[in-house]
Every structure is written in C-alpha cells, then in structure tokens.
C-alpha cells in the first residue's frame, strides 16, 4: 500500500476541517428550521463526539491523569468557551440570522486571536499580523457593506448577529488560551467534550 506524503495529508486535513466547519453552520441552520433547541443540538453533538473519541482516548487519559488534573482549571475554562458558549451561541444565532452573516462574523476570529494574544501577552504582534488584521477586517467590511459606505453607516444588528459576536469572542479567547499550553490534543478534545 502506498503511503501518503505529509504535505498531501496536511492538505487533506485542512480541507476536511473547512468542510466540518461549514457543516457545523449548515447543520445549525437546518436544526433551527426544524426547531431543535440550540442547547439540545449542542449537547447531542458533543455527546456523540465523546462516544466516538472514547475508545481512542480512554487508555491515554488514564496514563496522563496527572497532566489532566494539573490543568483541570484551564481545561474546564477551555471546555466552557469552546463547547458550551461557542456552539450554543452559534446555534442560537443561526435561528435568527443568515448562515452567510454568521460565517462572515466568525471569519474575523483570526483577528480577535491576534488581539487577545497581544492583550494577554501570550504572543508578540508583528507587522505582518497587523497587516493581515487590516486586510481581513477590510475584506469583511467590504463584503458586509457590499462596498457601499452608506450600508456601513446604516448597519443594524439583530439578535442572531449579537449571538454570533458572542460565539466569535468565545472561540477567539479559547484559541488564544489554547496557545498557552502544549496539550495532547486528542485527549484534550475528549475531556473538552465532557
């Protein structure tokens, strides 16, 4: 059997990550149409993830029990931000706003990660990151306003947009705090899904 090159595998995983992220928004919107409560959708989604990960992580979790106990506070905060706040706020927002609006707001997460990393002194900010922030925000504003300044001045937010912003802040803070520790990611993902 032919093995896949690391570059090919990395590219494949990046494409799959994008598909899963997009699927999260589509499933969230579909669930809102058939009236599945956001909290229920979030619970069942992560319960299923917990069950799927159990056979792959159980042994390692027992071996790494000390690492988990030493980081229990951080793991709990990360779990609350990523699982509870982000997903519940995102699914709730999709009940009241369009998928494209939610995706556009979430696309500013890298900008917020840079900002949180700077504010929490986790990572120094450089010229390229500042340039990226500028171009990212410009692009998002360009799309949201359809390149019309009047649209920006008359911009109004609905309940869904506010919850999309909450989701964006939660995921940004989660991603920033995740940089603080070198974690065994599969086991952390399992613990986080609890």
List the predicted regions and their residue ranges.
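Hydrophobic core positions of alpha-helical segments in small-molecule transporters
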Residues: 16, 43-44, 78, 105-106, ...
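Specific alpha-helical transmembrane segments that line the substrate/conduction pathway
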Residues: 40-51, 87-127, 167
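Helix-loop interface residues and adjacent transmembrane-helix termini in multi-pass membrane transporters
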Residues: 34-35, 96, 122-124, 182-184
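Residue-level signature of transmembrane alpha-helical cores of multipass secondary-active transporters
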Residues: 13-14, 75-79, 91, 103, ...
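Hydrophobic transmembrane alpha-helices of multi-pass small-molecule transport proteins
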Residues: 53, 125-147
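Residue-level recognition of pore/gate-forming positions within transmembrane alpha-helices
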Residues: 18, 46-50, 107-111, 133-136, ...
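Glycine-/small-residue-enriched transmembrane alpha-helix faces in small-molecule transporters
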Residues: 1-44, 153-180
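Specific transmembrane alpha-helical segments of multi-pass solute transporters/efflux pumps
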Residues: 20, 24-25, 54-101, 105-106, ...
């Amino acid at each position: 059997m032919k093995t896949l090159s690391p570059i090919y595998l990395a590219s494949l995983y990046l494409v799959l990550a994008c598909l899963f992220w997009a699927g999260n928004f589509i499933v969230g919107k579909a669930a809102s149409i058939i009236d599945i409560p956001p909290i229920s959708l979030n619970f069942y989604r992560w319960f299923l993830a917990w069950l799927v990960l159990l056979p792959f992580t159980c042994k390692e979790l027992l071996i790494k029990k000390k690492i988990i106990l030493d980081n229990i506070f951080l793991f709990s905060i990360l779990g609350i931000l990523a699982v509870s706040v982000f997903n519940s706020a995102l699914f709730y927002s999709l009940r009241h706003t369009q998928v494209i609006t939610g995706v556009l707001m979430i696309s500013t997460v890298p900008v917020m990660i840079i900002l949180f990393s700077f504010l929490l002194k986790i990572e120094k900010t450089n010229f390229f990151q500042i340039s990226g922030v500028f171009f990212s925000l410009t692009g998002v504003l360009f799309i949201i306003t359809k390149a019309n300044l009047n649209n920006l001045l008359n911009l109004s937010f609905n309940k869904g947009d506010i919850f999309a912003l909450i989701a964006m802040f939660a995921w940004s803070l989660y991603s920033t705090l995740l940089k603080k520790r070198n974690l065994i990611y599969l086991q952390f993902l399992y613990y986080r899904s609890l």
